[in-house]
Amino acid sequence: MRLRLIAVGSRMPKWVEEGWHEYAKRLPQELSLELVEIPLNTRGKNADVARLIRQEGEAMLSKVQPGERIVTLEVHGKPWSTEQLATELDRWRLDSRTVNLMVGGPEGLAPEVCARAEQRWSLSPLTLPHPLVRILIGEQIYRAWTVLSGHPYHK
């Protein structure tokens, strides 16, 4: 099974990269977790933010192959408990398609990305810093896998 986090933003601090890689490497070989970074467009005082979001969305969608699943991470998505995420992870595994978890930039996701989503997931009603979201997703995917495999990490 292949999971990809497609996230707007690059050049994260070292602690973010280390946190992400720590959880990604804990997963078994048959569950790969990859990170695809989309460069954040420069936002100036007079920037056309709608155009920038649209461009970022196009760049995100260009990384998705036909038939792959898109799951957006957004504040208005559905909150999942760890057990619910484990159930989704198991469904995705049985479906055998690549799953693309999409995280937008500071202003969120392009409408075109949201329109392609098969599922919408909310990590929290709180506004979370994007660097932390990467680590949180990695940890939660790892935790969901431990639930499915009976590993004691989740207890």
From Swiss-Prot:
Binding site for S-adenosyl-L-methionine: 73, 104, 123-128
An example Gene Ontology CC term for this record: cytoplasm
Top EC class of this enzyme: transferase
Annotated EC: 2.1.1.177
Domain of life where this protein originates: Bacteria
Catalyzed reactions per annotation: pseudouridine(1915) in 23S rRNA + S-adenosyl-L-methionine = N(3)-methylpseudouridine(1915) in 23S rRNA + S-adenosyl-L-homocysteine + H(+)
Location of this chain's protein in the cell: Cytoplasm
UniProt function note: Specifically methylates the pseudouridine at position 1915 (m3Psi1915) in 23S rRNA.
Protein family (similarity comment): Belongs to the RNA methyltransferase RlmH family.
Subunit structure: Homodimer.
Protein name: Ribosomal RNA large subunit methyltransferase H
Organism: Pseudomonas putida (strain W619)
